[in-house]
Amino acid sequence: TIPESSYGEFKNAPLTFIKNRFSPYQMVRENEDQKFDSFEVYFNTDNGYVAAKYDEEGDLLSTFQRFNDVKLPEKAKEKIMQKMGGDTQILSAKMTAVSDGWKITKEIYRVDVRSNGQTEKVKLIKEGDRYSL
């Protein structure tokens, strides 16, 4: 579990946090008598988690991230406003992301919005620099 004092850093840039604060190579050294092809490490907070998969040498293979109550990137907000109209209010957002090594390949946002007095859920997908609803 990530300490509360480090939570903001982890939530804002989870892969950077993991890269700077976790040594998979130490784990490999400490378990060199074990036979394994890969291993997973889970980084948890009250608001979400990252599951990181490493190979037998300690190199990052992939991650799966899920966070609640995230702040949407500006481009994501703009895409929602374009689609739903200017009176749209963003109520909350959840984010799921996957990476190939250290590179995020896909982000999925599930957003609760209020527009024209109605509350609805919007799914927004980011692949590369492109957002789609």
List the predicted regions and their residue ranges:
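The feature marks either
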Residues: 1-12
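Intrinsically disordered, low-complexity regions
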Residues: 9, 86-87, 118, 129
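Exposed beta-strand-loop-beta-strand "reactive/processing" segments of non-cytosolic proteins
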Residues: 10-52, 98-123
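A short, surface-exposed beta-strand/turn
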Residues: 51-62, 119-133
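Long, charged/polar, surface-exposed segments that mediate recognition or autoinhibition
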Residues: 52-92
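Low-complexity, flexible helical/coil segments
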Residues: 76-80, 89-90, 101-103, 124-131
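Extended, compositionally simple fibrous regions characteristic of intermediate-filament-like scaffolds
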Residues: 94-96
